[in-house]
Structures are given as structure tokens and as C-alpha cells.
Regions:
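An N-terminal assembly and electron-transfer interface module characteristic of large anaerobic redox
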Residues: 1-166
């Protein structure tokens, strides 16, 4: 058994604070109770015996969030306008693979390498042919799970794209 599930927790009053308990319950129901669910938080909400959050782990997590934010932002700006349907998603998959390989080998973990990767990511997405038509811009607000999970929002993003919205 070489797997664990990490989830961030803020301890706030939103539904996300319950996710850790729901994940554990789901794992038990699936006969996977041996998989530890580790709370990543800075407020001491839970103790995780046998595991310590180290500075290199924190650094990788921060870099992963920054890479993820950049890719989501550029993909969301390009996808509604792409001329070749699916090209943005293929680019996301390609960069996801490159970054996973980089994280495993330690590449892309310096500020200089990250900056270079940021420039490459932006340049690659910029090669995707797009239309310059004006589209209605829609912002989805609300609870984080509902905003970002197709299951939680009944595939809202796909619906909005099919209706010609950004």
C-alpha cells in the first residue's frame, strides 16, 4: 500500500470542511479504509501520525497550484474560441504530462525553471488557432465543489460552451 489521499482544510464554516470525513466514509464503503486521508492544514485541525509536512513538500504543492492556476486560466481563455474542437484539452493533457514528469525528476522546481515553463505554456496555448468573435462571458460563483465539479454542477461548463459562452 503506497497511496494516500491529501485534502486541504481551512476549518471554515463551509461544506468543504466536511469533505475529509466524506472521503473516509466513501473509502470505507469501497473496502479501501486502509488508504489514509491526510488533512493538509496550518491550523492543527487534525493530527496525521507518521506523516510530516516538509518544506520541500510545501514548495512542490505551491508550485503545483501555480502551474495548475496558469493552465486553467489560459485554457479557459482559449477553449471557447478554439477553431479545432478539443485542441485546448489536448494541450492541457500534454502539459499535465510534462509537468508530472518534471515533478518526478525535479525539473521545473526552481523559480527560473518555473518562469521558463510559464512562458512556454503561454506560448504553446497561443499557437492554438482561435476565432475573434465576441462571446458572452459567464462567471460561475458559489461553493467550490459546485463551481469546479462537472458532477456537482450538472456539466455546467460544457453546457455554457455549447451555448457559445466564455
Amino acid at each position: 500500500h503506497k497511496i494516500a489521499l491529501f485534502i486541504t482544510q481551512t476549518g471554515g464554516g463551509c461544506r468543504a470542511s466536511n469533505y475529509i470525513h466524506l472521503l473516509r466514509k466513501a473509502l470505507e464503503k469501497a473496502d479501501l479504509a486502509f488508504v489514509p486521508v491526510i488533512s493538509v492544514n496550518l491550523s492543527g485541525l487534525e493530527k496525521n501520525p507518521g506523516w510530516t509536512l516538509t518544506l520541500p513538500m510545501i514548495r512542490k504543492m505551491i508550485y503545483a497550484m501555480m502551474y495548475g492556476d496558469l493552465i486553467v486560466n489560459v485554457a479557459n481563455q482559449v477553449r471557447p474560441y478554439e477553431l479545432n474542437h478539443g485542441q485546448t484539452d489536448r494541450m492541457v493533457d500534454d502539459w499535465q504530462g510534462k509537468l508530472i514528469d518534471g515533478f518526478q525528476t525535479g525539473k521545473g522546481m526552481s523559480r527560473r525553471q518555473m518562469r521558463e515553463n510559464f512562458d512556454r505554456i503561454i506560448a504553446d496555448f497561443d499557437t492554438i488557432p482561435v476565432s475573434h468573435e465576441e462571446k458572452v462571458r459567464v462567471g460561475v460563483v458559489g461553493e467550490i465543489y459546485v463551481k469546479f465539479s462537472p458532477l456537482g454542477n450538472n456539466n455546467l461548463e460544457d453546457f455554457l460552451l455549447s451555448e457559445g459562452a466564455e
